[in-house]
Structures are given as C-alpha cells and as structure tokens.
Amino acid sequence: MSYRMDRHSYAHTFGPTVGDKVRLADTELFIEVEQDYATYGDEVKFGGGKVIRDGMGQSPLSRAEGAVDVVITNALILDWWGIVKADVGIKNGRIYAIGKAGNPHIQDNVSIIIGPSTEAIAGEGMILTAGGIDAHVHFICPQQIETALASGVTTLVGGGTGPAAGTKATTCTPGAWNIHRMLQAADGFPINLGFLGKGNGSQPAALAEQIKAGAIGLKLHEDWGTTPAAIDNCLGVAEDYDVQVAIHTDTLNEAGFVETTIAALKNRVIHTYHTEGAGGGHAPDIIKICGELNVLPSSTNPTRPYTINTLEEHLDMLMVCHHLHRNIPEDVAFAESRIRRETIAAEDILHDLGAFSIISSDSQAMGRVGEVICRTWQTAHKMKVQRGQLPGETGNNDNLRAKRYVAKYTINPAITHGISEEIGSVEVGKLADLCLWSPAFFGVKPELVIKGGIVAYAQMGDANASIPTPQPVHMQPMFANYGGAIAATSVTFVSQKAAKKDIGEKLGLSKPLVAVKNIRQLTKRDLKLNNYLPHIEVDPETYEVRADGELLTCEPASVLPMAQRYFLF
C-alpha cells in the first residue's frame, strides 16, 4: 500500500514539485515548477536511512556499464528553456542526462544510473542554474576571477593585460605577444576564459594577426579611436575569421553620429557594449541601436537597476576609468555627457521588454565583477514592482520574467561569442558548469559552484571544526582550484585559426582549447527571450526615450532586495 505525503512534507523532503512556487531571495519574484521528472515514490535521496544505498537507489553497475560520476538529486532547474524539477547526471565533466536517477534494476523510468562510482550532491530544496558568463571583463587584476567564481560566474570574456592604462579603459588584449601571455596565465585559473584583441585599426593585417594568435574576437573602443573606417575594417576581418566584434562607440560624436556607426556596420553582426550609453557611446542616443537586427545589445551592471544613487556614483567612476582630470573642463564635459537619468531609466524597461539582451560587469572599469547576477535579479525585481506581471505569463508566477533574466547572463552571451555548444545552459552535452542556490540566497551567494563537474567554490565553515557548518561560513575555493584539476575542468576559448595552428602546444598550455564558431551569421533573433526589435527615438533636448512610440520612463529605486540584508560591507 502506497503512502501519500502532503505537499508541505514532500517539499521539505524532496523539494518542490509541479504547481509549487519558490520565492527568489527577498525579491517579489516567484517561480512555479512546470515539470517534475520524478517518479513519485521512487525518488532518490542520499543520507542515513535514505534511498541511495546499495541494492536500493544505488545499483551495482560500474562506470563502464553506465553509472554517472556525479548526480545532483531533486534540484529545481531554472534556465531559459524551463523551470523543472529533475535529477542531473554528470559524466566526464559534462551534463550527461537530465531526468530520473536511481537503480534501473528495481526502479522504473531511470535515465541516470547511480552506482558505486557515483558521488551525490543534494539538490533537494535548491535551485540549479547554469554558471554565469560575463562577456565584458577588463582583466585588470587576477583577483577578479576569485570574486567572479564566488558569485556564480564560471566564464569570463574580455581583454586586458593587468593594471595598465589601456586595460583599465578598453577591454583589449592588444597584439600576439600580450595575447600569448594571457593565454598562458589562463592555465592557472579554474574558470573558462576568452580574450578580445584590439580592433581599432584601419588596415587588416594587425587585426588578423591577433586572431591568429588566439583572440576570440576584437574590441573597438572609443579611447583608441572608433572611427567609421576602423569599424568597417574590423568587421571585415571578423567576417574572414568567424569571430565576434564588441564595440564601445564614440561618445563625443567626433567621427560621426550613431547613424554613421550604424551605416559603417553594413548589417554585419556586432556585440554592442554599453548600449544605454552611461558607460560610453554616442551621446545621447546610442540606445537606439538596440532596434537593429544585426546588433546584439548588452549593458553593464553599474546602471542595473536605476536607483537614487546611480547618477552620483557614475561621474567619479568615469573620471578614473577613462584617465580624465577634474581640472580640465573638456574632460568634465565629456564625463557629464554620458550620465543621463532618462536613458538609464529607459534601460531598465528595455531589459524587461527583452530589447536589451545581455548583462555583464565592465569589471573595475565602472562595473563590479561579483555583481552581475545579483544586479540582474534586482533589475527583474524592480520591474516586477513597477510594471507588474509580464504579458505572456501563464499562471500567477514570474516564470517568463525569470527565464528572460537568467538568459541575459547565461545563454545569450554564450550565443553571442560562439561558445553556446560548450556552455551557457543546463543542457545535455555541455560542460557541467553549474550553480546550486538556496532559494533564500538565490542570486546573492551560491551554496556550491560546480566547474566541469566538480565543486570549485562552496560555502564552507571553520576547517578545524568537527563538521563543515560552524561559523564563519563564507565562500572558499575547493579542490577544482588546485593542480591538474584546473585544466581538467575548465577550457580556454580561442579562434578557429589559432586552434588549427596548435597554439596550445606551441605555448605549452595545459587547458583544452575550444574554438569559437557560428558567429558571423547571427542576428538578434537568435538570442533567447531577449530579441525584441523596437524602433527607438531619443529627444535630443530632453533625452526622453520612446520605443515604438511609447515613452519609457520609471522612477529610481530607493530600496532594493538582495542588498544590505545579505552583506556586511
């Protein structure tokens, strides 16, 4: 005779199931379970007196006979494609299956075999997401990587060589020699890395040599001169080598206006950093570029979301990052032209509409590398409070909004930079770069960060304690950070040309090199849940922004979730 559990008891034992709702941290966002892969009564769970024991939920099958290396049990997956409860099997560092784990000898519908070779990670009552991807990183210091990993970000794309003036401002790793040194440095970090070369040049040769050296793309930045000629030449080289171009356009409109830049693109795909403009770009109307089909638009986290403090902090940040001086009037005017409350407010709404597709950090160059994820969800919360439930939601939940926002720092940057076959979502075959969150700490502090199938960072207590939980509990590096495990669980992204030239062998690299691909044919329609193409108008006098004729405006937030409740500093 079967035993029937009430919903409350079931949720506390195996986690929520279909129809149950989960609050995300202290936000006003609630997600509802859409599907559960469990066979009720045959769920697996590890522990004393629990199911994953020999002859019960654990089979006698070997790894060679199909047992997985790691199983995450009863996790609530939140990804762009769905919100589902499932077990996740990991094998050879990749997601092997999403479904029902257990012992096929005695249980039905088993798609993930647990055996003596299987480690168990408890996902009951936890939310599982793909590791975050930050696609706008100034590699100013290596300590950024620890901070990013601890926040749930497992891939960094950007440029730089350290705390040089060029790196502080422009996200470029310029030239083959610098690219090779950064590729060698990448071997020391348990994170996926990809580097952008300098794209500012009016002749192809100097740009092509950077791609051949291993750059996964090129960055055009106004501080190096983003002229129409440089844009045209850079995109021409990118077309030849199937790499992405990221652009920070001309704030001062010296070489042309936003229309000039759009014309120079010639309908070729490009990743626009700072699409709103506070971080840089044609003043005051770079924001209108998000309505172009060939533009993959992102913005960075210092303006996410618009608050009562946003404008005040930006001026000082901008002066430092772009090597400006307060005693030079022209420098001050340059800085002030970029900070506009109207376009920052519109940025909130354009993210909520899915017109802006990606959120990244702009690390130490006006952005915070450890806050990509929490600021994304703060924006989602603010929009829920100010704009209500999204049209298209089914049921009394925020599932569509949650999927839209998680896509902004996972699958969409992966697609944009040609790495979505490897990472960017919780899907079979991809690297097992995953984050496990307690719902109360969702988006703020992950419980576990899994890199290539093994725990890389975790909330860990006193190492001299008798159990793992005594205070102080804080995020600390785990075994994936050491020795050969780094190369076994992370990859470095390079161009197809560099991969074919065996650049790894020539430089003595230990990490696997993965070539970026399928980039130049992209359009905004390829981005998930964030592909709205509005006609944007910006009033040159008032800076008011309209999308398809509708005025986009909202009030700054004075209080946010996921903030001081969770942090001492």
From Swiss-Prot:
One protein family per Pfam: Amidohydro_1
Binding residues for Ni(2+) 1: H136, H138, K219, D362
Post-translational modification: Carboxylation allows a single lysine to coordinate two nickel ions.
Residues with the N6-carboxylysine modification: K219
Keywords from the named record: Cytoplasm, Hydrolase, Metal-binding, Nickel
EC number(s) per entry: 3.5.1.5
Molecular function per GO: hydrolase activity, acting on carbon-nitrogen (but not peptide) bonds, in cyclic amides; nickel cation binding; urease activity
Cross-referenced CDD domains: Urease_alpha
Sequence ranges assigned to domain Urease in this UniProt record: 131-569
Gene Ontology BP term (one): urea catabolic process
Cofactors that this protein relies on: Ni cation
EC category name: hydrolase
Pathway connected to this protein: Nitrogen metabolism; urea degradation; CO(2) and NH(3) from urea (urease route): step 1/1
Annotated GO CC locations: cytosol
Chain residues that bind substrate: H221
Annotated catalysed reactions: urea + 2 H2O + H(+) = hydrogencarbonate + 2 NH4(+)
Active site (catalytic residues): H322 (proton donor)
Keyword hit for Metal-binding: yes
Disulfide-linked positions: none
Keyword Cytoplasm carried by entry: yes
Record's subcellular location: Cytoplasm
Primary subcellular site in the record, as a coarse category: cytoplasm
Residues the entry annotates as binding Ni(2+) 2: K219, H248, H274
Subunit composition and interactions: Heterotrimer of UreA (gamma), UreB (beta) and UreC (alpha) subunits. Three heterotrimers associate to form the active enzyme.
Family: Belongs to the metallo-dependent hydrolases superfamily. Urease alpha subunit family.
Protein's recorded name: Urease subunit alpha
Organism per entry: Synechocystis sp. (strain ATCC 27184 / PCC 6803 / Kazusa)
